[in-house]
From Swiss-Prot:
The chain crosses the membrane at residues 31-51, 74-94, 112-132, 143-163, 173-193, 196-216, 222-242, 285-305, 315-335, 350-370, 384-404. The keyword RNA-binding does not apply. It comes from Renibacterium salmoninarum (strain ATCC 33209 / DSM 20767 / JCM 11484 / NBRC 15589 / NCIMB 2235). This is Na(+)/H(+) antiporter NhaA. Pfam families: Na_H_antiport_1.
Length: 436
């Protein structure tokens, strides 16, 4: 008797503990996304009101000092992008390391699809932007990376607003894709957008980073030691000319994920402890404040809005975020699924993947950061890029809403199925099923 091997499935459910962890993360990010949306709206209203001068005066107000010749006299807007976003990337780094060491990304068969989707979602938008601006000059081409990012908090806020009951597997895919996307984004920032590179400061940063690594590997949790080391690392990376948010990722990668016995099944390590402490600070404070100072752009009414959208920078960003993200993510997912002879998990359709791919076109936080790095905070191209990012994110959200709402009744059935515990063991029955 010949037994056929069970077909590989894309978007399979996680284990139940992983399902609970992902659900908790998404809940916090959804709240953060709502605050992010509120901060963005407040910034746009203030920046286009009769009192707009006070907004820009606040954003550009300098605070800090310059000890030992260090350049720490920064504007509030710069503190938000260089300092607060380092917390955001610290959380992204913790999540990425956990996924690769103790999560789904440690298994090639589960990792290949979200990684390929993230790469496709970065490469295709970058290509589209570059093709549109091929003859526009080097300055404009420098913005090629702006449409490569996905804002998970904003995307989850959209899901909350439209009240979709998206299956856990799809939400997990979106989160994992965004985590990989963040790694690619920070790599792009570090490699392609340094400013007056000073290698000696990078070398000096290795000292506090090494001490921080030693301390966390010893499972030391004392903030009297860890926080000063983290701040010194941040300062030295900032002085090096590499964007200071890179320090957040480097510090995160130093933190151990699993316990000393290195068995992922024995529970979380120090990384999850830090994540629990800092995720609310990142999602609820750091990112909304950054959005408040970064999203405020004086549009200049309808005439100013249409003028912004005639800039090839804006055209490239809008096309790349709306079309490029959808084509790149959907295309890569479809290609990997078909070439590995896998199939979508039961109850899912390719229209679900398309909806998620379009939703990933919401590229807000990191896109705004890269725009400032590419063009400079005071450049007209940066203002046009902000308008384009906001416009493209809104259009992507509306298109995704249409597609996902069509499937919402079906999602309700899947969500109900994921809550049935007929055997009363405390674990919904669908999570008891094994998928080899």
């Amino acid at each position: 008797m010949i037994t056929s091997r069970t077909a590989r499935r894309t978007f399979r459910r996680n284990s139940y503990p992983e399902h609970l962890r992902i659900t908790a993360i998404l809940r916090k990010e959804t709240v953060g996304g709502a605050l992010l949306l509120a901060a963005t709206i407040a910034a746009l209203i203030w920046a286009n009101s009769p009192g707009s001068e006070s907004y820009f005066a606040l954003r550009d107000a300098k605070i800090g000092f310059n000890p030992f010749g260090l350049k720490l006299d920064l504007s509030l807007g710069a503190w938000a992008s260089d300092g607060l976003l380092a917390i955001f990337f610290f959380i992204a780094g913790l999540e990425l390391k956990r996924e690769f060491i103790a999560g789904d990304l440690r298994r090639f068969d589960r990792a290949i699809v979200p990684i390929a989707a993230a790469i496709g979602g970065v490469a295709v938008p970058a290509i589209i932007y570059t093709l549109i601006n091929l003859s526009s000059g080097a300055e404009i081409l420098n913005g090629w990376a702006i449409p490569t990012a996905t804002d998970i908090a904003f995307a989850l806020a959209v899901l909350a607003v439209i009240s979709t009951h998206l299956p856990t597997a799809l939400r997990t895919f979106l989160l994992t894709l965004a985590v990989v996307d963040d790694l690619i984004a920070i790599s792009i920032i570090a490699v392609f957008y340094p400013h007056n590179l000073q290698p000696q400061y990078l070398a000096l940063a290795l000292i506090p980073l090494g001490l921080f690594t030693w301390a966390v590997q010893k499972r030391i949790r004392s903030w009297y030691l860890l926080l000063p080391l983290a701040i010194i690392t941040w300062v030295l990376v900032h002085e090096s000319g590499v964007h200071a948010t890179v320090a957040g990722v480097l510090l995160a990668f130093a933190v151990p994920v699993v316990r000393r016995d290195r068995n992922p099944d024995n529970g979380p390590g120090l990384a999850e402890h830090f994540e629990h402490r800092f995720r609310p600070l990142s999602a609820g404070v750091a990112v909304p404040i950054f959005a408040f100072f970064s999203a405020g752009v004086a549009i200049g009414g309808w005439a100013g809005f249409t003028n912004s959208l005639t800039d090839t920078v804006a055209i490239g960003i809008i096309a790349a975020l709306i079309l490029g993200k959808a084509i790149g993510i959907f295309g890569a997912t479809f290609l990997i699924t078909k070439t590995t002879r896998a199939s979508l998990d039961d109850g899912l359709s390719w229209i679900d993947v398309l909806g998620l791919a379009i939703l990933a076109g919401i590229g807000f936080t990191v896109s705004l950061l890269i725009s400032e790095l590419a063009f400079g905070a005071d450049s007209p191209h940066n203002d046009h890029a902000k308008v384009a990012i906001l416009t493209a994110s809104l259009v992507a959200a509306l298109l995704a809403t249409v597609i996902l709402r069509i499937r919402n009744q079906h999602y309700r059935k899947l969500e109900k199925l994921e809550s049935v515990d007929a055997d009363g063991d405390g674990v919904p029955d669908v999570f008891d099923e094994k998928d080899d």
